[in-house]
Amino acid sequence: MAEAVQENPTELRGEAKKEAFHQEAESKIENFAFVRPDVVIPDNEKIHVKLAGTDSCRASVQILNKGGDNNLHYHPNMDLIYMVLQGRIEFYGPGDKSLGVFGKYEGIKLPENSRYWFRSVGDEEAHLLQIAGYPRGAKASKRIPVEAAKRGPSLWIGMTEEELRIRRENNQHG
């Protein structure tokens, strides 16, 4: 009888640890929705709207006016998946080589260190879903320009002051 009592607390302790592990993760579950912010986006510009993030991934929507684009760059510690939600986006690689023109619900996967840039090529405002994955615990993604920036950094909506500070410290715009 003493042995059974001795084994039982060990099992309970293991089960309790497992349950605490799951409860901690589940306490971080968040719902989100994309709502276009009521802001005017200057011609040929774009903004980012943060949807959600963890310490190993982030999702945001970039909103681009017609002609809105960025410069050739890469991310040494981030894999990217993009999908067009509205409008048309053309992605380019080095030498302005077209990687494809994408419409609604089409997209592209860009592994870390892939050099790319993109531009809104449709007649309407474009909404581009960005899903970024990076090493667990990374403070921020890195953005390394290959060519000079065409403008200053994009406006980010929905980020905390700390997230914005870290982003400024870790990103180069050319």
Positions of predicted regions on the chain:
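Short, conserved beta-strand element in jelly-roll/cupin
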Residues: 62-65, 74-91, 131-134
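Asparagine-centered strand-capping/turn motif at beta-strand->loop junctions
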Residues: 118-122
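A short hydrophobic beta-strand segment most commonly corresponding to one strand
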Residues: 81, 109, 123-142
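Short acidic-glycine-tyrosine-enriched beta hairpin
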Residues: 95-112
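A short, N-terminal "cap"/entry segment at the start of jelly-roll beta-barrel domains
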Residues: 1-58, 71-72, 143-174
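Short strand-connecting beta-turns/loops that link adjacent beta-strands
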Residues: 55-56, 77, 96, 123-124
